[in-house]
């Protein structure tokens, strides 16, 4: 991040069974160490939330003494993949609204931003896991928490991905297809529009409608950096390709 001129960033690990303990015992101590080593980059605690009844969302917590306790509380209680065996009651629209209500009660509430909102769409305006109705309901309940969505999703380096030490896992998963953002035909869905999600890209589309309703609804661009393209992944380093300006 420092190399590519980023002033701030947020770490957003995926959730999973009992992952709140991973955050508490492993990820957070490493974040504290990173803050000491690279103090010139503001580093927020967050996670890629397995959203009840929707696709992923980014949670970004303010830097406070209670930041890790707040994240663990929300993840352990509401992340749909936290429990094992899988609990279907954690994957409902009402569970997501309960999560937002709990976030509102925190002394320093997080921000929530919808990730790759149309990646599971099957066609233009044929939405998948995340829908306009859901995002409106989130913003209705918690307008200072649910504030936006990814306009330009990560995984934009997929076209230049190359295997460094072994056959790329992307090739195993996608074949020779290299859809930007891992949207599109390889997954049976609808591609990005020049690297932008359809909810953002279309004039008069979803983003414009949210703004036209008077909602304060922002878009972001992030790296979704799992594995760098030079190591066979689909990703740039944070700030290497796109940046979010605040």
Where are these regions (language model features)?
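Extended, charged catalytic domains and RNA/DNA-binding interfaces, predominantly
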Residues: 1-246
């Amino acid at each position: 991040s420092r190399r590519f001129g980023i002033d701030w960033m947020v770490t957003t690990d995926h959730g999973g069974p009992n992952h709140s303990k991973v955050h508490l015992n492993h990820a957070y101590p490493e974040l504290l160490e990173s803050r000491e080593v690279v103090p010139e980059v503001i580093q927020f605690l967050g996670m890629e939330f397995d959203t009840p009844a929707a696709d992923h969302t980014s949670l970004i917590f303010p830097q406070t003494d209670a930041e890790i306790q707040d994240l663990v509380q929300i993840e352990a209680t509401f992340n749909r993949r936290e429990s094992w065996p899988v609990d279907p009651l954690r994957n409902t629209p009402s569970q997501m609204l309960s999560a937002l209500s709990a976030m509102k009660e925190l002394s320093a509430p997080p921000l929530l931003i919808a990730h790759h909102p149309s990646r599971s769409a099957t066609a233009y305006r044929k939405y998948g896991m995340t829908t306009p109705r859901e995002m409106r309901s989130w913003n209705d309940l918690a307008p200072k928490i649910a504030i936006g969505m990814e306009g330009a999703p990560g995984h934009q380096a997929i076209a230049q991905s190359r295997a460094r030490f072994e056959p790329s896992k992307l090739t195993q998963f996608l074949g020779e297809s290299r859809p930007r953002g891992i949207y599109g035909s390889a997954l049976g869905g609808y591609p990005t529009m020049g690297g932008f999600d359809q909810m953002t890209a279309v004039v008069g589309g979803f983003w414009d409608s949210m703004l036209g309703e008077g909602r304060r609804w922002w878009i972001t661009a992030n790296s979704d950096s799992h594995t760098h393209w030079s190591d066979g992944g689909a990703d740039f380093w944070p700030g290497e390709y796109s940046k979010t300006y605040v």
